[in-house]
Amino acid sequence: MNILVYRWNSYNYIDIIATFQSMGHQVDVIEQELESYDEDESFAAHLHGILQQKNYDFVFTVNYFAVISGVCQQMGIKYVSWSCDSPLLSMYHKNVFLDCNYFFLFDKTNYLEFKGMGVKHIWHLPLAVDTDRLDELFAQDTMDKMQLAEVDSGNASKHSVRDFAGGISFVGNLYEKNSYDELEKRFPEYLRGYFDAVMEAQLNISGGNIIEPMLTADILERVSEYFELKKSKDSFSDLGLVFATTVLGFKTASLQRQRALLALAAKFPVNLYTNTEIGRASCRERV
């Protein structure tokens, strides 16, 4: 099959593209920064032109882009997306109901939600990894024989895999730069106290999300005085969903990750790989 992949800065693409190719499929890649996930006339025209030049079986993306869905519907081409974020705000758009879409969601709750809305082609598919790549990475007789190349300021240096080994490692974002910290300065004392309590409660609950249900109509009315909801005309997301996800959700994740790392580091050596203040994701730091 001929597959056109729209690629953004998601780590999943390396394994996915390699897997497509290992199955004998032809993969072409398009990369272009979007003005909006929902509407971008320049990108839509560019994508339309590419799809006219070659007979593609489907377009693939990690996560969902309504603008791509719209073009695929016009061209009569299948659009396949596999989510890696939850909730995926870009899916709360009228284009999810187009026939061209084929959704694979890693979060079963979101899968059930959109299936219940009447989305036609949708399946639950957990996240995956290219096991062949990892098996090859660790196939050497000893870790010392394996070398990883790291580019730093244009100079390539070699590191043994042993340099990156550790009993406990965290790879990811600490979200120490989040919109809540800026908004908090403008919130009245009541809202600050309310949100602090909601986030603390969420941190003590495993397997459930209480943040959005705690955003009552009264609370959201107060929030609207300080937080502007920006969305396209065809989006059906609302203030509660967006604020719970992009503001309180990221702040809660930041608190949870930092507290867990500090608690672990108090008793054990912990390796942290992140793109936040202490350095780039390729850097290794002791917590």
Q: Which role does the model predict for each range below?
A:
Residues 9-11, 63-67, 86-88, 106-111, ...:
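Short, polar loop motifs at secondary-structure junctions
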Residues 2-12, 120-121, 126-146, 154, ...:
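Nucleotide-sugar donor-binding catalytic core of glycosyltransferases
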Residues 72-87, 102-105, 124-127, 169:
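Active-site proximal beta-strand in glycosyltransferases
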Residues 23, 75-76, 98-99, 117-120:
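Short, structured coil segments at secondary-structure junctions
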Residues 92-104:
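A conserved, positively charged/aromatic
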Residues 38-40, 88-95, 113-117, 133-138:
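Short, charged, surface-exposed secondary-structure boundary motifs
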Residues 103-121, 131, 259:
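A short, active-site helix/loop in glycosyltransferases that binds the activated sugar's phosphate group
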Residues 1-75, 240-257, 269-272:
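N-terminal pre-catalytic "stem/leader" segment of glycosyltransferase-like enzymes
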